[in-house]
Amino acid sequence: MKKLAILSLSMMLAAGAQAQNAQFDYFKYAGNDARFNVPIDKSHQYYNPVLAGFYPDPSLCRAGDTYYLVNSSFTFFPGVPLSTSKDLVNWTPAGHVLTRQSQVPLKGQHVSGGIFAPAISYNKKNKTFYMITTNVGAGNFFVKSKDPSKGWSEPIYLKKIDGIDPSFFFDD
């Protein structure tokens, strides 16, 4: 018993000797990286990332000659930023998918909740865009639009579909 007490005390002292205090430093990002000041031949080169900044969980689809990109917005409102591109390099902000409070009830959500991993799809047969996502704490839902620049439907909740990161598949 005495040996066990001495061994335990020795281990506690050794663990305490190895403990170090965490050190934190200040971080600031102003959005003007020097790398973007280096000239490139834009006829066949581009900067990577093509979208610098906060664009988590990207999903894209193509309709005609235009690509559509959506990203997670978590508990920020309006929700799900939408961008368009003709070449997958030059992107233009095109508003948000969830622009009405009725589309995304965020009241009472913590910062770690909200809209995660939206997926955008285009169905050629009915010429309709669909955006499906998970509202953490409220479930999976989708919205649809014939023209993303003119707004999206009210959400259609998938009450019997659990899980996260849903996506649509349209068979040709």
Across the structure, where does each feature detected by a protein language model lie?
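Bacterial Sec-dependent N-terminal signal peptides
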Residues: 1-22
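Carbohydrate-active catalytic/glycan-binding domains of CAZyme proteins
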Residues: 20-172
